[in-house]
Amino acid sequence: MSNSLSKRLFAGMAAASLGLAVTACGGDDKTASNVEYDDTVTVGILHSLTGTMAISESTLVDTEKMAIDEINAAGGVEVDGKKYKIEYIVEDGASDWPTFAEKSKKLIDQDSVPVVFGGWTSASRKAMLPVYESKDAFLYYPIQYEAQECSNNIFYTGATPNQQSEPATKFMYEKSPAAGKPFFLVGSDYVFPRTSNTITKSQVEQLGGTVVGEDYLPLGNTEVAPIIAKIKKALPDGGVIINTLNGDQNVAFFKQIQDAGITPANGYYVMNYSIAEEEISTIGSEFLEGHYGAWNY
């Protein structure tokens, strides 16, 4: 497939996705039946179906497959007067950054896909970026990220800090009843949590608050007890916890902070950047009641 056609199909899929979103908002569920296609185009879907990030990424696979089915039912993607049916190949990134790069190469070189929908963590994206740039293929990246990066081969669809963490930090500063407005930052140990928290530290200082502690866990490590002990020591009278833990680390974290009395009833409020419906159903809503999350629409 020519690079020019790949780019136009890439744009066509984006337009088709937007059209479906607008249709859904309008409540019109009519789709074309018995569609006749002139050709097919295959795309890749590359997320973690196993490992620590599967709790978040497996739902993305289901959502992307559903969107492709809806686009096909609505007539597919039209480029230069030809209708293309979208087919997909699913690969497992296995919560391992080198695997994301290897699977990207496989999808592009062996399966000849022009576009891949993939990744979650910034670590996975940064592992994949050289692959897409060197092969002039395209990656749809679906989640918030730390910004400070721009590539002609990546379509960044998630929020940047000025759209997520900065307004969330201001909200939590204003909400916190604790004297001195103390914050504790906890995250998974990779680029997004560390970069996001660097921005947060500067913002908290400008607002007049204090970052009293900061700690990180290697992604996949669920030994959260030492961090919880540090939070209790640094915030004896309550305060704000900015949480950038990812994957199944959040299951252990929220169950154990409740056991430790780190709850809204005791003046502790957690702001989360990577918890949505999928994680809530696994963690249990009773462990998250009274805490907060910030996402772009």
Residue ranges and their predicted role:
Residues 1-42, 73:
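Short, low-complexity disordered leader/linker segments with a strong preference
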Residues 28-34, 55-62, 77-149, 157, ...:
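Beta-alpha junction/loop-to-helix N-cap segments that form part of ligand/metal-binding clefts
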Residues 40-61, 119, 182-187:
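Short beta-strand segments enriched in small/hydrophobic residues
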Residues 41, 62-87, 178, 205-209:
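Signal peptide-proximal N-terminal region
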Residues 45, 107-120, 140-142, 182-187, ...:
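Periplasmic-binding protein-like
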Residues 49-52, 93-97, 121-125, 144-149, ...:
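Solvent-exposed loop/turn segments at secondary-structure junctions
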Residues 102, 153-260:
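Extracellular/periplasmic Venus flytrap/periplasmic-binding protein
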Residues 257-297:
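Extracellular/periplasmic periplasmic-binding protein-like sensory domains
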